[in-house]
Swiss-Prot record:
Key word Lipid metabolism present: no
Name under which the protein is recorded: Phosphoglycerate kinase
Binding-site list for ATP: K197, E319, G345, G346, D347, T348
Upper classification of the organism: Bacteria, Pseudomonadati, Pseudomonadota, Gammaproteobacteria, Alteromonadales
InterPro entries on file: Phosphoglycerate_kinase, Phosphoglycerate_kinase_CS, Phosphoglycerate_kinase_N, Phosphoglycerate_kinase_sf
Organism: Shewanella pealeana (strain ATCC 700345 / ANG-SQ1)
Known catalytic reactions: (2R)-3-phosphoglycerate + ATP = (2R)-3-phospho-glyceroyl phosphate + ADP
Length: 391
């Protein structure tokens, strides 16, 4: 993979345009979760240290394209960066026809989705963005799976297009986990639906030594094994698909283990009473919300012996503590394991935070959809663009 890296370039006196993923939650004009902003700081600081005039752009939320909407303004991000960078940071609303930026200054462009043509990767818009810079830096792994004007088109037309340290680090870590993994390799795929993760399950099942399913996905596999799932969330039309995945895994000497014990309740609520049952004892009125302690220990043992662990999705409704023990045990096992571990996806990162294991995970991926598409083996448009420009 030949991709230029920003850290290897001479940026002295250069106009550097960085595409970050600064799509953070904002409430009453204040950023409420700054994880993505913190992740972007080293790249912005490095560009400043290298003597660049720095421009930063991102989307924020889902405004109607082509229309200004104060609710989705980048102003709260600018306020945050002003404090975090300890240097002048200004917001620019009108920049497409040219903007003056001084060396040592940071200018944040207003929400890129206020520009008509952003999502469609409009060539005229991309060329205007490209004309603003000497070097374009793609550093937003979270949007690398989208071919849009600010993530893809601009890079085709900029004088130089390179990856930022955050994106480069992400690709390196994911490559290490998927291209040449330390064995045995274990993938834990949770979440509510098999249908949304089917291609991920198929792709991973051919790469890993052990595939583990959790959450609503596991319920479909429980049903596929011939057990009742009561009123649990599951997909009856994908039972044959689940059986095929299990058969494929077994034909390669692996398996997709089904929980032996589960935690059930009669309703989905934070006050629901949790009851532990053997998987064969689930009644018609039960809803499965977590794996039981025996199943959790069996998975912890698999993780303990792994060389590589990829974690995408919780194994239970961990938002409610009485259904969080399974996910908590998985998190602890990953934290205690010597394996190279990667965690990605919004719910997974919330679990990593809740159980305080962030510093024990080898790599935490900033991408949601991009992380999944990488696991599926799909080519990410922004990465393909950087490769074509790196030749």
């Amino acid at each position: 993979m030949t991709i230029l890296n920003m850290k290897d370039l001479d940026l002295q006196g250069k106009r550097v345009l960085i595409r970050e993923d600064l799509n953070v939650p904002v409430s009453d004009g204040v950023v409420t979760s700054d994880a993505r902003l913190r992740a972007s700081l080293p790249t912005i600081k490095l560009a400043l240290e290298k003597g660049a005039a720095v421009m930063v752009m991102s989307h924020l939320g889902r405004p109607t394209e082509g229309e200004f909407n104060a609710e989705f303004s980048m102003q709260p991000v600018v306020d945050y960066l002003t404090k975090a960078l300890d240097c002048p940071v200004r917001l620019a609303a009108d920049y497409l026809d040219g903007i003056e930026v001084a060396v040592g200054e940071v200018v944040v462009f207003e929400n890129v989705r206020f520009n008509l043509g952003e999502k469609k990767n409009d060539e005229a818009l991309a060329k205007k963005m490209a004309a603003l810079c000497d070097v374009y830096v793609m550093d937003a792994f979270g949007t690398a799976h989208r071919a849009q004007a600010s993530t893809h088109g601009v890079g085709l037309h900029a004088p130089i297009a390179c990856a930022g340290p955050l994106l480069a680090g992400e690709l390196e870590a994911l490559g290490k986990a998927l291209d040449n993994p330390a064995r045995p390799m274990v993938a834990i795929v949770g979440g509510s639906k098999v249908s949304t993760k089917l291609t991920v399950l198929e792709s991973l099942s051919t790469k890993v030594d052990q595939l583990v399913v959790g959450g609503g996905i596991a319920n479909t596999f429980v049903a596929a094994a011939g057990h009742k799932v009561g009123k649990s969330l599951y997909e009856a039309d994908l039972i044959e698909e689940a059986q095929r995945l299990v058969a494929n895994a077994q034909s390669r000497g692996g398996d997709i283990p089904v929980p032996t014990d589960v935690v059930v309740a009669g309703e989905f609520s934070p006050t629901a009473t949790a009851t532990l049952k053997d998987v064969s004892d689930v009644s018609d009125t039960d809803m499965i919300f977590d794996i039981g302690p025996d199943s959790a220990e069996a998975l912890a043992e698999i993780i303990k012996n792994a060389g590589t662990v990829v974690w995408n999705g919780p194994v239970g409704v961990f938002e409610f503590d009485q259904f969080g023990e399974g996910t908590k045990r998985i998190a602890q096992a990953i934290a205690e394991s010597n394996a190279f571990s990667i965690a990605g996806g919004g719910d997974t990162l919330a679990a990593v935070d809740k159980y305080g294991i962030a510093d024990k995970v080898s790599y935490i991926s900033t991408g949601g959809g991009a992380f999944l598409e990488f696991l599926e083996g799909k080519e990410l448009p922004a990465v393909a663009m950087l490769e074509s420009r790196g030749q």
